[in-house]
């Protein structure tokens, strides 16, 4: 695990530690881990803001920070957005994109789920739009989320986003800015 000697898990919350002080402690919160952490914070009468502030106060380094918008009513049509992007129907700072179709080809449910990546996956900022409900159906899981729009930030962009979030306490404004500053589908 990333060169760390010690590994701890609580649900999907992963913590790694090392004798090497320069490596610090590594906290990994993927999808379910973020929700697990939210339950822990609620039990402590804390929120994400206090947690992130505490991490920074203790000298924490933020390598990656993702923000997500859950589309509960199907406003985002990933296939249509992919076509628009491919045909130049979007104004974007980055011309890189990738459209991926995935799913199972056997059984009753042969629906493929679409994923659209906007921007380079190796950059400090890119977007991932995908059909969450179809993705979960291939795992035989149910969700009310039809589509998800993720903003994936790394290194300097991640730190800037966290600092802005802690300064303004306005996640909606931050998400709106990050999207409209990067891409527009007229």
Locate each region found by the language model.
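Structured, helix-rich domain cores that form ligand/interaction pockets
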Residues: 1-186
């Amino acid at each position: 695990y990333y060169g760390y000697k010690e590994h701890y898990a609580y649900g999907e919350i992963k913590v790694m530690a090392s004798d090497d002080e320069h490596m610090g402690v590594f906290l990994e919160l993927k999808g379910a881990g973020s929700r697990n952490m939210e339950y822990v914070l609620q039990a402590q009468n804390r929120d994400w803001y206090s947690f992130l502030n505490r991490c920074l106060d203790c000298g924490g380094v933020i390598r990656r920070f993702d923000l997500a918008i859950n589309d509960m009513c199907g406003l985002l049509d990933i296939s249509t957005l992919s076509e628009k992007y491919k045909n130049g129907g979007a104004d974007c700072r980055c011309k890189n994109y990738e459209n991926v179709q995935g799913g199972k080809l056997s059984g009753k449910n042969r629906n493929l789920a679409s994923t659209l990546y906007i921007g380079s996956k190796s950059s400090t900022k890119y977007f991932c739009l995908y059909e969450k409900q179809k993705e979960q159906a291939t795992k035989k899981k149910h969700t009310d989320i039809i589509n998800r729009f993720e903003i994936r930030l790394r290194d300097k962009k991640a730190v800037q986003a966290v600092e802005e979030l802690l300064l303004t306490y306005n996640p909606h404004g931050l998400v709106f800015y990050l999207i409209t500053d990067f891409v527009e589908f007229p």
